[in-house]
Amino acid sequence: MVVREKQGGRMGKGKGKGKEKECDINCFGRSFFRVLLTLQSLERMKIPSSFNQCLQNQPTGMVSLVDRSGNKWSAELTSDSEGFFFVHGWKEFVRDNSIQCGQFLVFTYDKRSQFSVTVFEPSGIDKISTFSAHPSKNVIIKTESDEGGMVTAAITTEKMAPALKENNGITGKRTRDVDYLMEDRVVVFKKSSEANVCESSRRKRAGASAGKSKVTSTSHNSTRGSSCSSDEDNSSSKSPNPPFLMRFLSGEVSRRGRCVSKGQRQLTVISQRRPVTEAEKDHALQRAREFKSKNPFAVQIMMESYVYVGFFMNIPCEFVRECLPHTNKRITLWDPQGKAWEVNYVYYSDRSVGSFSGGWGKFAVGNNLEKFDVCVFELVQKDNIKVHIYRVVPEITPHKLRSDPK
């Protein structure tokens, strides 16, 4: 988009105000679009330089971002020598609308300090999930405990995800803190035309049959034999485990679903990895994006609430809707060494989203996952997911574990 340059020299005070008003009238209603291609654009988005002329009378500071349903988010508009940017608050808008790399956004400058935003999929179709997006707020949700029951999760942090309906009729509720969706990052969904796992799952759900088909589990050997194009580390399960880690993996140390109610301690993993660079993070993501398979798969970047504390991992929405069960159940994760890990898969029907809860912490700690590592979740068989790990730092440095007083 090219905006005509303002011509003419200095003008009188009266003419200046008239020109400013005329500029606003000409610019309000104009649009620009951005394709989100980098991780940085999910946290700090640059407005095209050709649109700067329309913002010459727009003061920097807080502005409103409005979705197609009329919901509003606040974000800070800043400027520097490179141009205008959306910064503080932009990350929350991205998270609440499940915006991912590869999607593109159309911004319309409605009026002073307000932009309307429409999100489109890479296919060019507007994103359906944005219709149900809402600004972040404090919520109470239900998540599944390690024992298979439901746990009441009291979320007290600001900037949280939209409320999720409770799953009534499940007992055994306990209170615990959840760091949920605080640092959700880019997800990528890929589905090969050869894959039929998702299609068969949808047909079975649409059939509304009275009985449930028997689940065929993937054997240890067959999962080992599946092709793997990642640089997964084969030493993670062989590395010596600290005594506290072994106690946690064996279940001796109280897990997150039961700590708060007993007045005990909540498990926290302390990373011993060296500091990492943005280039290393991008390189890990790039390697994961090069993964190819005939099976459907999703890419997820590990964040603090997934691997250091809380151990509650959000699964890419498209992967959940297209390929995973639309009910709570146990799912088997297969690590790069072929070891099986049972995890609780929690499905929220009102938004068609899912998460890994009980058991995910054991998988994350057992495989020494770190923040910014990238995992590819490949659906190799019904309720069986092979996890390919792309580490930011290939060398594994065992975690330290501690129980923080609550």
Swiss-Prot record:
> Is Protein biosynthesis there in the keyword field?
no
What is one GO cellular-component annotation here? nucleus
Q: Where does it reside?
A: Nucleus
Keyword Protein biosynthesis in the entry? The reply is no
The set of disulfide-linked cysteines is: none
In terms of domain of life, where is this protein from?
Eukaryota
The protein's predominant localisation is: nucleus
Query: Which residue ranges have biased composition labelled Polar residues?
Result: 214-225
Entry keywords, A to Z: DNA-binding, Nucleus, Repeat, Transcription, Transcription regulation
Q: Name one Pfam family in it.
A: B3
One GO molecular function term?
DNA binding
What PROSITE patterns does the entry give?
Answer: B3
Protein's recorded name: B3 domain-containing protein Os11g0197600
Instruction: Name the PANTHER family on file.
Output: B3 DOMAIN-CONTAINING PROTEIN OS11G0197600, B3 DOMAIN-CONTAINING PROTEIN OS11G0197600-RELATED
Q: From the UniProt annotation, which stretches of this protein bind DNA?
A: 30-123, 298-393
Membrane-spanning parts: none
**Record's InterPro entries?**
B3_DNA-bd, DNA-bd_pseudobarrel_sf, REM16-like
Give positions of region: Disordered. 1-20, 199-245
